[in-house]
Amino acid sequence: MEDRIGIVVGGGAPAREGIDLARPLINNEGHLDKIGIAATRLNATIVREALSDAGVSVSGTIPNRVDEAVLLLEERPVVVMGGTTPGHTTDAVAIRFAIASGADRCIIATNVPKVFGEDPKTNPEAESHDFLTHDQLQEIVGPAEHSRAGASQIVDPVGVSEANISNMTLNVLDGRNVDLIRAAIVGGEFVGTVVRGA
């Protein structure tokens, strides 16, 4: 069987802006999450259409659930999806998709080069990590709970907990560098943080 790739697209600025716009009107975090999820699905559609136009054999629809994505991955080598349900971010969706599809690792593309012990935007002296255990990463990101719609961390705490339970390797890297993503996918030299079980 040829290699298969599942891509889970986050909401980014459109999700945060939509949530911020709605927050004065909506007090329910689950309802605000739905706004973020809609943004992830829009972004996923953009990525899916771009890949299709480039000639990539990508699934024709954006799945709503991880089990649906796994079935689509049996039909096409590339599946693109966004968020699913309130209570977690697309990091958790990506980790669940990787686990359910039997992947050997889940690549988390972020906007920093590695996992840091503290936010490098607020502490320029924060220490970066090449390797961490799931437990160490959980300590950095906090307990496995969803705190607030639109919240952003290096990796979703809910997803970290699920990766730990399933012993799913996480490769956290700077998603702004396409060459790093390519190397992580094809097994080239990895630059980022590898997270594994103890």
What do these predicted ranges mean?
Residues 1-198:
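C-terminal catalytic "cap/lid" subdomain
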